[in-house]
Amino acid sequence: MAQLQAVKGTRDIFPDEIARWHYVEGVIRSVAELYGFSEVRTPVFEYTELFQRGIGATTDIVGKEMFTFQPDPNGRSLTLRPEMTAGVMRACLQKNLLSQSPVSKLYYISDLFRKERPQAGRQRQFTQFGAELLGVSNPAAVAEVLTFMMQVFSSLGLHGLRLRINSLGDLDDRARYREALRDYFMPYQNDLDEPSKERLEKNPLRILDSKNPALQEMIAGAPRLYASLKPESVADFEKVLSYLDDRQIAYDVDHLLVRGLDYYCHAAFEVTSSELGAQDAIGGGGRYDGLARELGASNDLPAVGFAVGMERLMIAMEKQGLFATLNPHGPLVYVVVQQKELTDHAMQVAFRLRKSGLKTEIDLAGRSMKAQMRDANRMGAAYALFIGQSEMESGHYALKNLETSEQTSLDLDAIIEVLHEAVSQESARP
């Protein structure tokens, strides 16, 4: 019988790599707390209609990339979430969250699912962190989430990033721009690839998302959305840029940036990394005031958010050597059992140490002392506590500092005190 393997486009994450994930997640949570964002968690699957209405029927995500299923032949279609914003908005509307507070600031670290061709930093099951700020219509909200995102990157030590930003205007602005794009691309209709021909009819803005090298020169000559913006939209965008200038956040205005989701309006942005090659996007976001109405609300709801791909983020960090100094802490103390028959007593000692809050490891396999010491060194234990027959009878145990080789014999209460003092001294180091 053939050995089962992980599903294509998924991957297992083992303890040595988990330490990196915990570190990055810890930084995200710390920065989120600084900015007053609280964590939200939503279901892994939603009704398919949520994403069709929320993301947009003409997007690649809805058209090609969703994992959709129908558990009940007579029931509604369900989809594994391909992104988080639509689900977060659905949850907030369902709970009527903004009736409790006029502003809602939420963040998430969540697994998502898309039918993509697996490659480095792009899996069919992947993780994003992101934030959504609901209830604030002025440009300060865009600056708030952008600053939050960029502070996460700087706190992680990441460099070589490029922030591109554009204004997509409001519905009227985009309607004018779609007609301008249709007029521009129509004479080139025979030169377009099949996906772009379809987009020309349904939503010509999506042509600007094409990665087809043969179309890039044509796309570069397309009209700029900025020329279709009304004065109010221009003023809104310029205020966002002034906030970024005030915070000394470098950016490039890219008038061809439209992002891949239909719900964006006004400011939209994307961050790329020089470490990621052709697929260089590490995250992005923007305003999406009309999403609430698309999901059944009676009015638009001011909203802005971003999402960052964790796998891509960590690839960029790895290439910049930002994990090199990350040293996952092993156990503080390793309980070494000198005779197999003393294992029960050693487990009681380990229980006391753990109950007092000390990170403790113990051999349960009855291996030799040499093997146990080798294991303690491999794990990076700071101390070894030896349990033999005489130690058990006297209640005094040998405690060895594995860095200095200094060894002393103490009762268990004194050992616990010594170890807590060692933890305190380590925590006090700069």
UniProtKB/Swiss-Prot annotation:
Pfam families: HGTP_anticodon (PF03129), tRNA-synt_His (PF13393)
Family matches, as PROSITE patterns: AA_TRNA_LIGASE_II
Primary enzyme class: ligase
Localization: Cytoplasm
Ligase keyword on record: yes
Family of this protein: Belongs to the class-II aminoacyl-tRNA synthetase family.
Complex and partners: Homodimer.
Alphabetical list of HAMAP family matching this protein: His_tRNA_synth
Name of this protein: Histidine--tRNA ligase
